């Protein structure tokens, strides 16, 4: 299980998708779980702390079941709370946490939907990084700042970390 966490616009999904493709190229069975895509299927999940917590735990449970059946799971979710991510870590046989720590200023610059601006104007509440906290991982396996490296460089670092941590390759 490779779990990407970070602010909206940090580059989590971009790098995660690239890593998933690299793993598929190696012949691995891979499933990509993206937080936004899952929310589109289950729109009743809101953004309060308890709803976010439940969402992360549900996705984590699904990921753990896929992992149990031999699928390499690549998940990309904001997953802002350390406790939720630690819960998911406990469900999985292997858990590689990738903290995409791109500065909020860069995340805002990349925000094509204008969500950060809406949150700053008070039009959106409970927006992670603005009026809801993001709890950075205490001991992630890897920290990436995508404002300082290309997608290829970030993906290569993830692949190195996976191989070292999980023994893939």
Regions found by a protein language model. Name each.
Residues 12:
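Conserved lysine of the Walker
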Residues 4:
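Hydrophobic anchor at the beta1->P-loop junction of P-loop NTPases
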Residues 1:
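Walker A (P-loop) ATP-phosphate-binding motif of ABC ATPase nucleotide-binding domains
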Residues 8:
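The conserved Walker
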């Amino acid at each position: 299980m490779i779990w990407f966490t970070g602010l909206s616009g940090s580059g989590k999904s971009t790098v995660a998708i690239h890593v998933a493709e690299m793993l598929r190229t190696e012949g691995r069975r891979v499933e990509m779980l993206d937080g936004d895509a899952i929310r589109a299927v289950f729109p009743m999940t809101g953004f309060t702390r308890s709803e976010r917590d439940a969402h992360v735990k549900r996705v984590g449970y699904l990921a753990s079941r896929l992992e149990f059946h031999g699928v390499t799971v690549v998940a990309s979710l904001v997953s802002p709370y350390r406790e939720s991510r630690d819960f998911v870590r406990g469900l999985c046989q292997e858990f590689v946490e990738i903290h995409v720590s791109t500065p909020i200023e860069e995340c805002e610059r990349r925000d094509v939907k204008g969500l950060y601006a809406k949150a700053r104007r008070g039009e959106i509440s409970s927006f992670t990084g603005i009026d809801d906290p993001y709890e950075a991982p205490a001991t992630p396996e890897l920290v990436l700042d995508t404002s300082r490296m290309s997608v290829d460089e970030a993906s290569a670092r993830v692949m190195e970390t996976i191989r070292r941590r999980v023994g893939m390759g």
